[in-house]
Amino acid sequence: MTGVPIAIVRVAALGAMGTDLDSMVAALRGDHSGIGPANALEQRPASEAGAGQVDLGVSTDGASDGSQQHTQRADRAEQLLRRALDQLLGTDPTATLAVDASQVAMVLGTTLAGMRHCGAAMRFESSGCISDAMRSYTGIPAGSVMRQALAGLPIAGAASTVSCACASALSAIAHGCAVLRSGAASCVIAGGYDPISEFAYGGFSALQLVATGPLSPFAHDRQGMKLGEGCALVLLRPLPEALARGESPLAIIDAIGESSDAHHLTQPHPEGRGAAVALASAVVNGLPDLLIAHATGTAGNDAAEYQAYRTAFGAALPGIAVTALKSRFGHPLGAAGALELLATLKCADAGFMPAGLGRPVDRHAFPDINLLHTEPRAGSPHRITVLAAGFGGANVALSVTRGGNGAPVTVTERRAAPTSVRVGIRAVGCVSAGGRGLSGLRQLADSTERDVSEETLMPLLDRSRTRRLALLPRLMLAACRDLRDAAGLTADELASTPLLAASWHGAASFTEQYYRDLLASGIDLANPVLFAESVPNVGSAHVSLGLGMRAASATVIGTRTAGLEAMFLASCRIRVGEWHRALVVMADESHPTIDAVLSHCTGRAVRSGSAGMAFLMERIDGSNPELLPEVTGFEHGIVERGGSRPAMTGHGGATIMIPEIGCVAGPAALALEIASRQSNEVAVSCTDPNGFSWTVQASAHGDLKSFATV
């Protein structure tokens, strides 16, 4: 990490161990487990394995009457997020934030967003309640969950949701720090959430990852995980500003490490290589006094994680205290890592380190792990590191140093982030109904076709490796390989390049197949292949796997503007010096249910199409003297909810006719505007039906490399 230190000035969390952090600390002092009956599951499994469920009885903590009414109408995702926001911001959110609403950014992480609404919609359809079904379908995207939870709050800055499965919350915090350091916001709310759901329970059970006995991390007879739920949020400010305001930071973010295994969709690398890389970056400033393990209790995860610890810490490992709290919270998916970190920080303030539960450690397999088991240990660790890992091989490790509550807080001198870094677009890749490249995009407005043909895809894909994949990752892989041909990237260059994917609706076809089968066959007979191919970050996962990309990876999800949002986040990471380049890829599938829902929302017939597009964004500096098209800025806002637009607003207010190709539409319009050379300065705007509005500004000088065959 580079630039000014970032302070965690306020925190909030809900989990199976308590509906606020104070109640969690009290529970973690003893031997209480939050694992119990999973009454909130939409279906009951034949064998009750239990889960970590949050008590969402009506709360009055820090919530206005309006937010109370809101949470009673919402499903669990919106309730968890809104309750945490109310805790975080208190009774006077405007005074708490103390900056203009446009300067408050939000980066959230989630595994499944509003997926519970999908099951509700399908049940409404089966009952013939079509209007209710359409309304429920609109609640699935992450943008809908976020917009509902933000109702009435003074938050109007950049707002995005990222997904890299169970590493989502820590990934969101990493991106939030970059947004803050880039100057795009004065403060950032970051963290993650996920509710318990039949979608997740059925899938993990089908993969044989759910334990019937206790979750027992690093034990010889460990059986697997327990599903959980929760939400954990932090309010971030630059440390100098926080101190100037008289705020007492709970902690300072010391370092963050990110990596990808590029190994398997649902299994970690057996030697923990990616996790070791992330940990090494996170502890560059010093070893932790306490390590919060990911520790899902599955055979593969715990073995790989231990190998990562041995690689990262070596002979120092036995001296580092380790805690594994999913044995008490369950696995909260998109809140994982952040939830355990905040609970542990509060326990440290209270003078103890919390312990996990379950069966004893297997000392033969894990001889060097100093695991806190059953009994909390007295102590107030100064430096704490947390690791999170997710499907697709994403790894994020984060280290903090405690501050406030009597601990000294100082501003540490660090290398300043670049103040005038320029970000260029070296190359683009594209597949659309018009064919391959920008020439294909140009034909879309006049084409009657809406979907990418197999004739376009197959020359770009290894059929033996991709024929069983969902369409979404195939579109992304094809666009990336088109870009690779344009830019001439080597395998080594790809391996070290960070990856940000984007999708509005994800793998829509496989998701529908999985969920309809789940409802027809029952929660105990879910399809494991369809589940793995339906998670929102499946695109970034398969691109990482297919191209051997081992740096940071995540997917921006749930809005029509997700493609522009991914470009914004990549631009922030490049501008603050964390990344030199980034591969940004976006894709969306067409689907009749998407068309029906958008038609219902907008009052006009919508016929969506499929497309994939990739951008190679990189820093323009002395080592890169070429004249490249340049991304000069972004504007963003939250406006009144409205219909999805079939076209983009370009330079001078002119309308660029782009068919409905999801989150690809905005970036496609940008590429066409740059390539047209009608103006040196380009601006393209796009708005999501939930009111998230984004504009990207660019200078069109230089050559935009693209593979233009059709």
Predicted features, each with a name:
Residues 176-196:
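Short glycine/serine-rich loop segments
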Residues 172:
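Active-site histidine-anchored catalytic micro-motif
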Residues 186-189, 383, 580-581:
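Short acidic donor-binding loop at the edge of a beta-strand
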Residues 1-157, 178-181, 197, 202-226, ...:
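Conserved "HGTGT" condensation-loop signature of ketosynthase/thiolase-family condensing enzymes
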Residues 158-163, 553-556:
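Short loop-beta-helix segment that forms the pyridoxal 5′-phosphate
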